[in-house]
């Protein structure tokens, strides 16, 4: 059986009353000491963490080249590009596809390759930076490639406008120079028709951006891309949502600020007589058109303006073509007689109305089913033309991926040119992606601006008397590009947008362009304003071609008519030789013919934002009035150390200075020669 253990005497002194009281008094002190210890522990931990954080710099080099390098900035999560050896800031890219709070990449997965840096945010995206072969002498280039690791990741990189002026990219409705002042929501970086979509991108577009710090950003044509412009903050490149596509582009940094590396070179350049007189007479029948053309030419002769080109629009061309295209050879060329001694320009487009004889005839042949863009057919089904809208009509659009379709279309254009006796053929509607506009899957060869690029290459085979309405990766072709219509007012959608457009086109390699008609061709706030007409005329005098929609005798007084004659003569005698001279330089060096003020003052921040002056080559500065009612303006003379002669007053001024309140009456345009 179990027995209870016997208690034993331990020899301890029994606790007295004062001992118990002392223990009760010391208990709170023990608790306080414990709390103090915990507090000290936490303080030490926080101190160690803070010390580590302070010891680590806010920026960490991730890839260095010879002349520049890339860093990762903690906190906001940004890639930085800096020039060496001084570390001059060149570019800041805010990264929107990975957590900004994540520390800088601690591990380089490409550590074995000194020309690359790789890091992966395991749940979001992978980044790969690489040193690339230089795009031009004196430059250093970096490839940036983001790859999404989940289907729902949208890659987005934003390029800061802080202390950087940006140029290039797309044309827009109210063109700005630089594009820092532009605003646009995120939308596909594809050319478009501004008349149909004023908030979209315009017909001239390159995936090329140039910064005043000496940096360029170039995106490959096969990258699906959206662009947003946030005025005076940043512009952003991002991939379409839900498609898990990579985002990659190239950064190049140059010692030149901004860089002046050549773009596209060509061995040939187009020719176009000036001025162009646009026909806006009756178009109801071939007989009415011919009478209208004769009447226009008679008036031009009467006013001693009998030179240049008479331009017939698409509708007038179609009416004449229907009357003059007869099966037999009985009908002789009659159209040249209509406009002699001027030349004739006709207008075509890659569209055909679904009820038009052209479209219906094209469907008769066996091959003709492939002449038009079509939706991808289901297995076993026949293709259906992708119908779109052009000038308010339901139309089909030429299939530029079909050699048979292009051959048929070009043969028709040549036949029309011959029968109508035209010297020039203008093509409208070259811009845009019809599949993208209708949210239809795009064939791989027509991604982005593939349509514009393919059609431009085909049209260039017609010769250098060809004009197209858009440009994308086609600046190397001997084609004239028709600028977008402008409003008849003084805004950036009107007169103030003309010089920014000139600089934009020329910078991207499109030096041979036809500006909108003098005074603007879209209704604006001041239609028929003689002052607007004159100030517009003074600018286009110095451009490749002078174009008129409203003849001067209809809009203005006799003195404006006389001024028009003087401007046409000045264009022929002074401007055309300059353009020929600098077109040779463009072909050999790739430098634009029309240059911004910063071209001669690349280190002066004042020059970066001047949008109402332009240079022809390095020797002529044009500084017109673009404000209503003004007869004076401030003029920046670029090029410190140069001397500029005012052609109106014969006064000489130093370059690198600003002339304040310089006088220019309505009959004058300030022009300086170096």
Please give the residue ranges for each predicted region.
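Generic recognition of flexible, low-complexity loop/linker segments
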Residues: 194-197, 204-206, 296-301, 332-335, ...
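Short, low-complexity, Lys/Arg-enriched N-terminal segments of secretory-pathway carbohydrate enzymes
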Residues: 1-29
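Aromatic- and carboxylate-enriched substrate-binding clefts and catalytic-loop regions
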Residues: 305-568, 598-602
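Carbohydrate-binding surfaces of carbohydrate-active enzymes
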Residues: 26, 30-39, 43, 303-304, ...
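Membrane-embedded alpha-helices of multi-pass membrane proteins, especially ion channels
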Residues: 43-53
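Conserved structural-core and active-site-/substrate-pathway-adjacent residues in large, well-folded domains
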Residues: 208, 300, 337-339, 409, ...
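Short, glycine-/Ser/Thr-/acidic-enriched flexible segments
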Residues: 215, 222-224, 316-317, 351, ...
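Catalytic and substrate-binding clefts that recognize carbohydrates or anionic sugar/phosphate headgroups
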Residues: 53-274, 283-286, 297-302, 600, ...
């Amino acid at each position: 059986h179990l027995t209870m253990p016997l208690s034993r005497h331990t020899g301890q002194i029994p606790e007295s009353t004062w001992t118990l009281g002392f223990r009760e008094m010391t208990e709170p002190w023990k608790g306080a000491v414990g709390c103090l210890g915990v507090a000290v522990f936490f303080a030490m931990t926080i101190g160690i963490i803070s010390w580590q954080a302070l010891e680590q710099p806010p920026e960490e080099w991730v890839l260095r080249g010879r002349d520049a390098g890339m860093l990762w900035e903690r906190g906001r999560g940004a890639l930085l590009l800096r020039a060496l050896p001084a570390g001059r800031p060149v570019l800041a890219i805010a990264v929107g596809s990975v957590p900004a709070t994540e520390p800088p990449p601690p591990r380089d997965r490409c550590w074995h390759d000194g020309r690359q840096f790789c890091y992966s945010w395991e749940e979001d995206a992978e980044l790969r930076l690489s040193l690339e072969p230089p795009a031009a002498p004196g430059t250093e280039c970096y490839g940036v490639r983001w790859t999404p690791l989940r289907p729902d990741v949208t890659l987005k990189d934003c390029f800061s406008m802080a202390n950087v002026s940006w140029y290039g990219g797309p044309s827009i409705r109210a063109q700005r120079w630089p594009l820092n002042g532009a605003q646009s929501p995120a939308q596909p970086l594809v050319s478009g028709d501004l008349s149909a979509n004023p908030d979209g991108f315009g017909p001239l577009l390159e995936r090329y951006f140039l910064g005043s710090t000496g940096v360029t950003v170039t995106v490959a044509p096969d990258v699906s891309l959206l662009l947003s412009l946030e005025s005076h903050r940043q512009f952003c490149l991002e991939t379409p949502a839900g498609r898990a596509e990579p985002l990659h582009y190239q950064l190049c940094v140059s010692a030149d600020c901004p860089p002046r590396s050549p773009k596209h070179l060509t061995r040939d350049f187009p020719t176009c007589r000036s001025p162009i007189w646009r026909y806006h007479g009756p178009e109801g029948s071939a007989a009415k058109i011919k009478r209208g053309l004769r009447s226009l030419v008679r008036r031009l002769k009467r006013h001693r303006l009998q030179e240049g080109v008479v331009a017939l629009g698409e509708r007038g061309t179609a009416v004449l073509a229907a009357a003059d295209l007869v099966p037999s050879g009985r009908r002789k060329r009659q159209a040249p007689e209509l406009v002699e001694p001027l030349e004739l320009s006709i207008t075509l487009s890659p569209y055909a109305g679904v009820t038009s004889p052209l479209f219906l005839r094209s469907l008769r042949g066996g091959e003709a089913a492939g002449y038009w863009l079509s939706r991808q057919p289901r297995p076993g089904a026949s293709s259906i033309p992708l119908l779109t809208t052009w000038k308010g009509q339901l139309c089909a659009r030429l299939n530029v991926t079909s050699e048979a379709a292009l051959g048929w279309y070009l043969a028709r254009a040549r036949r029309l040119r011959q029968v109508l006796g035209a010297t020039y053929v203008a093509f409208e509607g070259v811009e845009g992606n019809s599949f993208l506009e209708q949210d239809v899957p795009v064939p791989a060869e027509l991604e982005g601006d593939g349509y514009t690029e393919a059609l431009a290459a085909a049209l260039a085979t017609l010769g250098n008397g060809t004009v197209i309405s858009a440009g994308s990766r086609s600046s190397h072709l001997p084609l004239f590009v028709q600028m977008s219509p402008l409003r008849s007012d003084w805004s950036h959608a009107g007169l103030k947008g003309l010089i920014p457009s000139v600089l934009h086109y020329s910078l991207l390699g499109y030096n041979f362009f036809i500006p909108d008609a003098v005074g603007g061709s879209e209704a604006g706030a001041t239609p028929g304003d003689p002052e607007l007409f004159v100030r517009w005329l003074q600018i286009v005098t110095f451009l490749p071609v002078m174009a008129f929609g409203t003849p001067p005798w209809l809009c203005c007084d006799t003195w404006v008519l006389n001024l028009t004659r003087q401007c046409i003569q000045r264009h022929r005698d002074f401007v055309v030789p300059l353009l020929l001279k600098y077109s040779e330089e463009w072909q050999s060096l790739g430098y634009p013919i029309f240059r911004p003020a910063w071209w001669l003052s690349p280190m002066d921040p004042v020059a970066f934002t001047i949008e109402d002056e332009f240079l022809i080559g390095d020797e002529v500065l044009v500084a017109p009035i673009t404000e209503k009612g003004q007869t004076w303006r401030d003029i920046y003379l670029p090029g410190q150390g140069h001397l500029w002669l005012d052609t109106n007053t014969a006064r000489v001024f130093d370059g690198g200075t600003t002339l304040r309140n310089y006088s220019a009456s309505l009959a004058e345009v300030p022009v300086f020669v170096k």
